[in-house]
Amino acid sequence: MKRVLIRPSQWNYDKLQNRMFDKGYCYQGLYQNAFCHWRELAKAEGIALDTWDMHPLESADALWFMDLPARRADVREARERAPHAILILQIFESPVVGPHFFHPQNHREFDVILTYDARRCDDKRYRSYRLPNTPSSPDSDRPFAARRYRAL
C-alpha cells in the first residue's frame, strides 16, 4: 500500500494524530465529510492517508502539505528526511489569508501544486482541484421553541 503523509496547515496543526479525518478540518469541522471521503477513496485505490506525525517521514511515498508552512526550512527538512517522496502542495486558503501561497517562487520545493486557481493549471505540475463544501448537520435538531435568539 502506498503511503501519503499529510501536514496540516499552520492554522490546523491541532488536526494531527489523524484528527482531520474524525473531527473535521477548518472552521467547525467544515470539511470533515470531504476528508473522510477522500481517505475512503484512497484506501480503495491502495493508498493510506495519515497525518505526518503517524509514521516516519522516510516511509512516505508522498508528503502532502496543506498550504505553505511558515518556514521554508520545514519543506527542505521534509525533503531531506524523505528524499524519494513526491512533495505536494495543496493551496487551501484564499489569497486574502495567504497571498504568498500563490507566488510561483514559493512553489520551487514542490513536485506538484494543487490549486483552485484554474488559470495556473497546466495539468502537469499545477493541477486544479475542487473541494466540496460538505457541512455536517447537528445530530439532533432542537425544536424551534427551545432555541434562544441573540441580537447585537
Give the ranges of each region predicted by the language model.
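N-terminal pre-catalytic "stem/leader" segment of glycosyltransferase-like enzymes
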Residues: 1-84
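Catalytic core of nucleotide-activated saccharide and alditol-phosphate transferases
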Residues: 72-152
